[in-house]
Amino acid sequence: MSTDVVFDPKRVDKKHNNGLNLPDSLIKRWWSSDVTAVNNSYKNNNVNYNREYPLPDIFRSDPRKYKDVFPLQSHWIMQRYVTKVNEGIYKFLNYFDMKSSTFAPGFNKKEKTNYIHRIAKDLAAKANKEEIRNYSRDLINTLINMDGYDKLSPYLNFLIAILSDFINKTPLTIPTDKEWSRPGFNRIMNPGLVKMQNTYDCIKVFAWAHNYEEPKILFDYLGNRVACLTIIAKDPSASTAAENVFISSEIYSVDRYIWAAAPFNTKSSADWLTNTMYGDLTEEITYRFSPCFGGHCISAEEILTRKKVIDLYVNGEYKTIITGEGHPFGTVFDSMGMLRDPTFNGPLKDLPFTFKSIVDGFLHYGLKQKVTGIMVNMPKDDKWDIDRIRDVLLWMFEITTYRDKTITNFFVDQYVDRDDICCVPFQVAIGSNFSEDRKDNNSLVRQPYFMDPKFIKKYETGREDGTTRYNLKFKIEEDDEEDNILSINQEKITVDFSFFYNKLMDGGFMNKMDLCEIIFRTYAKKSPHVYGYFLLRGKAIKTRSDMINLFNGELRFENNSDDIIIGKKIYENGVDQLAEIFKEYNLNTSENMAGRFKQDPERRYITVNKFVKGDRSDSGGGPPPPPPPDEEEYEDIADEEITITPDVTEPVIANERAAITVVQSDIPEIPIEELITEEEEEEEPTPPPPVQTVATVDQPMVEIVPGQNLVPVGESPMSAPDIDLPIPGLPGPQPQIMEVTSGGPIIEEIESPPILPIQPPLPLPAPPTPQEPPKSILQPPKLIVEPKEVVVPTPPVIEQPKTPEEVPKQIVPPSPAVVSPPSPTTIPQEPPTQPSPIPSQPPVNIIPTQVPPRPGIGERPYPFFEPITPDTPAITPPKLVIKKPADEVIVEEPEEEEKPFVIIDEDEKMGEVEVGQGFPEPFSDRLTVDDLPLEDPRFKSEDVDDIMVAIDSQLEELGEGVGGDGDGGAFIIDPTLPPEVFIDIVDKTINVIEKRVATKRKISDDEEAESESARTRTWVRTTPKDFSGLTAATRGPRINITPKKKRKIVVTTEEEEKLLKEPVTESVEDLPSYEEVKLLDESDNEDDELDITSTPEDMETLKQSRAAPIRARRRGVVMDEESPIKPGSQPVDTSDATKISTDTDELTQQE
């Protein structure tokens, strides 16, 4: 396929002014699609991609069948992308209607896919300023000249995202404070999101959901390939986009997505944070709470009727996860991100219907109980019955009342099944949030605690395939106060219903079912009859039996025929007729509830201040209510204690319903004055008697394969009997939580293996053992955590090791540590043919939380211990002067103290050599530039590295509207920028790109390599097997070696950039000749001079004195430069010195 498929102005038909000759009908047809059209896409020919591009069978079948073929930890999405044509790109290109356009007629599906690849490759392959400018201008002009450019402008962003996708292969890192506050960064790149993307090694695509259409473009382009998608809402209209994004997600089968709503109205959001419910907690909420990456509303039905609870091993810690597979139809509710993000203009105040009420009230109350997030979903249809509503209430009561260890993060994971109710399952992590004893912790990422295990009972059912299903229950014991689920820190918590009356709806409700009212009002948009029906249905709760029956789905109306009549009329006539219906039955309303419901977009809920006919038993708003007409009717609820204790030893029965417990408590209620806003303080509400509420709900089980990825349960999880299973915190294998002031608890599973190591575990020190330490190639130098930073009794300190077999000093290890099998993403894994010395003992890993900056980079932190990949900047090496006479290389090193460094062999990079197994095969299982299907002689992968680094180095100068990921290449452009601004941004980046590309192009020429190597300080790396284990970078005296061939890698760190800019005072011609250098070696270092034919005794001395330090550096271990390993400190078998290998694994085995 020729290269002229790319945008070529010469091929544009002159008689068409839209560049690609897009038919107007296509644009109008597509962009006029509304929610109904997308929602009914299976019936709508305009957007029926499901018919045109059917989903592969792998997504329609049981994903468990593919867990060995496409394991999650092996990036099965990437493997599928490499091996199959991506249907999402077809959808993306379908907008251009390639088959019918004169621009590129006759495209088949593969050619459409290659089209996008070529865009990225061509842009990355441009070698100079003019080429990039011209290409960019042509590309932009082609787009802006299309009809309906205002609709198609997102394509510009997607092209940039595509470029970033292909050229940026490094995982994201946690932003620094500098990056965090940089214009364009806007805190939307929060650490939680970054951590999650590192978890899955995701393709990083950032887009903006301004309107309804952009999400469709995004999903059409990305399709099933995207592993982690972030959609950033930049303005209030995004609520509509959000609704449709998730409808689209069902159609387009995105595997995982994240919703991050963050309009950029910083002042109004700051005012909201200050003036509403948080007050003096604003600073903690804004800066100390971990920003959440989080989701659309989890379906309450899925949360509770199909709830799955597992222990997920993420980032070196266990997290209790509730998995709910929700069906998102409507407004997005990111409770964590909205409440904590200073750029967000209030919690959902711009979103339709009463999610604002949920946030303003529920989360405020929940904050008092250390609740930081709630996710509730609205139903897509009108089929929700009282059982489902009860489940929603139980879940809400559960997180607001029962837990001191509450929701802090939202995880997205799980396989998707296109035929499932929704293909975007969610997981909600249960952990702790801000607490008094952690106020001084400035860590951006807060580590969660366990939910108190005494509240959990797990059950196990063995499966034929060896997997296990778990069921979680809450224990409610009537007489055991200490073990009662109501107990939080051994203190009773009062469920203050008056808070909801006064806080949530500006005037209260007619009864204690106000919470039901909140839930139903969220459904009023699509289900007005359900709203009105239950609005009145809740009025019938007057007795103990009513409360029980309501939550058992058996509410009786107690001879109140008006309730049934009114409810029936509302059901028949809808909410629009509420005013007339209420007037007919003498029901007074506040502010004409029907009119207010229809007219005020921010307050589309009905406030019933008083029922003239009937009772107003517990309304909290306005003046104090008159006494109820019949006080005896309410006495039993105040006098009785209702406790329903399910028998946890009984097998779970399908559709079994738990009950709600109402307790009259003597504990003083939470002062209402602390909970209401300044506006509502004028009302001076009168709270009703506090009621304590406890709920329990049966939860289905989840199928877990320890150490493997999570798979959904195929059949009904309710069918199997429950068997007691010990869990962390209970007798048996127990987690141990240790407080670390800089990063949260570190948990160790003592006996049982970790479950679901999705997040690649990170290197962590272990006590000195003969076993091989974890292999991490890159480490910050002398990263030592002082004992004062670790809050453990008498933390052990590792002495400086004397031998290579001892674990080098790195971090003071806390005694309990997380044990996790390594993941191919971050930790190099050995092939089966070369097992580690102790294969049964996997490496120990930990998350470093506060680390010194990387040398030569400046203020950028080094948050993760990442393996060096060909596009990861290496630590600044010592200066070298390299002379190449004939085939020999002489390496000269300065006398000053050198810093650790790593050299990467390109053979090892490509996974082509047998030796060097200490290095990972970085991209064997994920997308790289080399995996692109088309060959282009102009495109070179090293140019991509230069562009990536150059873009990153220029981000701070690019100005408003541009952001990056801090690691190069994640090029985020504000879509509102005009094309000329983008071109200017490109121009600002050209200088560095041009310099780097030109430099490397010159260096790559063999005839110029000798003269250019000294100027650019090019590393020369030889194949290890060619010179018996000695590297050119071996520390110590200069060594004469004769490599078979050389590999050149240019170190692209900022320090190296500075070196490139320094004037070169010494040319190659000025250097001493080879003979002179050799003579100098012999005269200055006669005792140390060694060559490749040295005796075994000399080899022993060399190996102990120099091979060990470089071996440690290649492992990423920080050596104490002031205490070098002394020769002879460890006996080494040198019976066959000629077979010594630099490979760390082989050498360790020989020793």
UniProtKB/Swiss-Prot annotation:
Residues 1082-1091 have a biased composition (Acidic residues). Residues 1131-1142 have a biased composition (Polar residues). Residues 867-878 have a biased composition (Low complexity). Residues 611-633, 709-740, 753-778, 795-880, 1060-1151 are annotated as: Disordered. Residues 754-773, 811-842 have a biased composition (Pro residues). This is Uncharacterized protein ORF78. The lineage of its organism: Viruses, Duplodnaviria, Heunggongvirae, Peploviricota, Herviviricetes.
